[in-house]
């Protein structure tokens, strides 16, 4: 099956008429997967759709579209003067892309902010799996992508040396990470945003990237990881040369590093429709330069929004009056971060819903693959819930007031299921927002109810006297834990290794993006050391209140 995936022709160029004839022939031939692209110019340009048809005469378009394809297929290939048929207009994609632009940028896209976001997915020269962020702003996309990439390494490549990962392997890990984020949208189809190139006099017509034999083998593995084996096999059989030829027809001659204005960029956006994630992985393998070129990060961000669907995104956000990308500073809002991490664009980081002044404000509704902790919680700007603090994998995006970085570990016990003791401690602390390690005696019944413990009034009154014998009006955390969870050990180890990533070169030693490793120690007791001059430790303490960490090589990583 792997041979089918990587067996693609990457040979010489086709003339425009040849490409048109071959694409039309492929559309009429036997194929079961539908792949649609639509030109979604945001103002006055046309939106187009091409469908690789099924073996029956039916297609995803109207019958007129099918007959048009048949006429194109019967036309002589040598008729170079015959113009390529214009596929049908996809008004939905055009409308949604226009509204997504408004949702992200507001009424006007500032040139300087747009330039900060205009970068591709690029790896560090000294840390082959670490993405580089060239300027402030796109960390709202780059940091979550890096987190998912590291999750794949931790879970699927145990024991691998990060410094020995090849470039081809890193590229395929990136594709898997992007597919994971798209899968979180739980959409019936995947709408991938593509930058159509302007015709020119360049000699290279296609953008299909030449890969080494090892790289092609890695591409097959990436396709397998992105979807089930059945999905990958279906994609391999259903879209053989047709996907490649269709991609070449889309990828007109153009300098991929040409600088575009915001209007020019949005006028060239097209969409490709895929039924399964394995086909998306194949597309990215065949068109890796769409990720690596100047607008790769923006294209993927638009793909996530379009795949999720504008109506669902707007329902998650609730308040769409403010753009998701700050018009002055260029950083992404929490809704954008949450969409990349969880597939839902909710604006808050607490668990489930909270009633604030009669308004139901939505937070994170389930345990996420990737966690999130932030310095802003220590500053009392927000409360991060258990779903984000205790993700499925030991990877957390870390937020400062201006930037996002990534914390990760190979220690899987950091995300093992909570013991009853840890649940009790967490619930108790949720009633102690100031971090004083005590609660009001009157809150004891609420805590017991939250823990599903006995909460009869007579029993609560008895426990209040026992836990507050001097009638001070407070119950200490230690007294509560000793009474209800005596001698229970915690699941988190006392010492473990942590690693940190910051994608901005200027925030790294010698301006080279790399991972920094440290040894963490969880101290006895519940009193945390206060170190206001160390934002890294302060942020870590929102997850592990009694943590201390010694960074190797004496270098303290930066959150900014």
UniProtKB/Swiss-Prot annotation:
GO terms for molecular function: cysteine-type deubiquitinase activity; K48-linked deubiquitinase activity. Its EC number is 3.4.19.12. The keyword Electron transport does not apply. The keyword Zinc does not apply. Residues 1-13 have a biased composition (Basic and acidic residues). InterPro entries: EF-hand-dom_pair, MINDY-3/4_CD, MINY3/4. It is an enzyme of class 3 (hydrolase). Residues 15-30, 52-81 have a biased composition (Low complexity). Keywords: Hydrolase, Phosphoprotein, Protease, Thiol protease, Ubl conjugation pathway. The modification Phosphoserine is found at residues 212, 219. It holds the Pfam family MINDY-3_4_CD. Residues 1-30, 44-91, 203-237 are annotated as: Disordered. GO terms for biological process: protein K48-linked deubiquitination; proteolysis. It catalyses: Thiol-dependent hydrolysis of ester, thioester, amide, peptide and isopeptide bonds formed by the C-terminal Gly of ubiquitin (a 76-residue protein attached to proteins as an intracellular targeting signal). The active site is at residues 139, 403. Hydrolase that can remove 'Lys-48'-linked conjugated ubiquitin from proteins. Belongs to the MINDY deubiquitinase family. FAM188 subfamily. This is Ubiquitin carboxyl-terminal hydrolase MINDY-3 homolog. It comes from Drosophila melanogaster. The lineage of its organism: Eukaryota, Metazoa, Ecdysozoa, Arthropoda, Hexapoda. The gene is mindy3.
């Amino acid at each position: 099956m792997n041979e089918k995936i990587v067996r693609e022709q990457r040979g010489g160029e086709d003339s425009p008429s040849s490409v048109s004839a071959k694409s039309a022939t492929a559309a009429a031939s036997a194929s079961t997967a539908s792949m649609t692209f639509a030109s979604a110019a945001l103002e006055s340009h046309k939106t187009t759709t091409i469908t690789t048809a099924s073996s029956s005469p039916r297609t995803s378009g109207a019958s007129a579209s099918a007959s048009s394809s048949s006429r194109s297929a019967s036309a002589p290939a040598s008729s170079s003067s015959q113009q390529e048929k214009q596929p049908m207009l996809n008004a939905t994609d055009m409308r949604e892309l226009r509204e997504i632009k408004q949702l992200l940028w507001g009424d006007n896209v500032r040139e300087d902010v747009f330039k900060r976001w205009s970068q591709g997915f690029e790896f560090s020269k000294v840390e082959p799996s670490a993405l580089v962020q060239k300027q402030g702003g796109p960390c709202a996309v780059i940091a979550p992508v890096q987190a998912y990439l590291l999750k794949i390494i931790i879970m699927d490549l145990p024991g691998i040396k990060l410094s020995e990962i090849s470039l081809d392997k890193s590229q395929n890990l990136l594709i898997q990470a992007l597919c994971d984020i798209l899968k979180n949208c739980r959409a019936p189809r995947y709408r991938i945003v593509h930058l159509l190139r302007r015709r020119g006099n360049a000699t290279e017509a296609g953008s299909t990237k030449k890969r080494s034999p090892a790289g092609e083998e890695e591409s097959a593995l990436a396709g397998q990881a992105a979807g089930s084996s059945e999905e990958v096999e279906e994609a391999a059989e259903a879209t053989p040369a047709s996907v490649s030829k269709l991609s070449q027809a889309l990828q007109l001659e153009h300098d991929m590093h040409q600088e575009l204005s915001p209007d020019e960029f949005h006028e060239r956006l097209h969409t490709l429709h895929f039924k399964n994630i394995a086909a998306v992985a194949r597309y990215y393998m065949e068109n890796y330069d769409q990720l690596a070129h100047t607008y790769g990060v923006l294209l993927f961000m638009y793909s996530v929004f379009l795949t999720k669907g504008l109506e669902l995104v707007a329902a998650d956000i609730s308040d769409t009056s403010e753009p998701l990308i700050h018009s002055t500073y260029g950083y992404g809002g929490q809704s954008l971060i949450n969409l990349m991490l969880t597939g839902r664009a909710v604006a808050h980081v607490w668990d489930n819903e909270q009633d604030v002044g009669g308004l139901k404000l939505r937070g994170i509704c389930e345990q996420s693959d990737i966690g999130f902790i932030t310095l802003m919680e220590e500053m009392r700007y927000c409360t991060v819930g258990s779903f984000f603090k205790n993700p499925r994998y030991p990877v957390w995006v870390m937020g400062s007031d201006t930037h996002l970085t990534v914390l990760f570990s190979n220690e899987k016990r950091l995300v093992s299921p909570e013991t009853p003791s840890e649940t009790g401690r967490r619930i108790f602390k949720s009633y102690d927002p100031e971090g004083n390690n005590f609660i009001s005696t009157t809150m004891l019944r609420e805590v017991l109810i939250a823990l599903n413990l006995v909460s009869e009034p007579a029993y609560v009154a008895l426990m209040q006297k026992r836990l507050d014998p001097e009638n001070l009006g407070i119950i200490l955390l230690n007294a509560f834990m000793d009474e209800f969870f005596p001698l229970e050990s915690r699941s988190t180890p006392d010492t473990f290794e942590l690693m940190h990533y910051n994608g901005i070169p200027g925030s790294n030693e010698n301006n080279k993006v790399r991972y920094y490793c440290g040894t963490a120690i969880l101290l006895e007791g519940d009193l945390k050391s206060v170190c206001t001059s160390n934002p890294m430790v302060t942020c870590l303490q929102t997850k592990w209140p009694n943590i201390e960490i010694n960074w190797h090589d004496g270098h303290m990583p930066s959150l900014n």
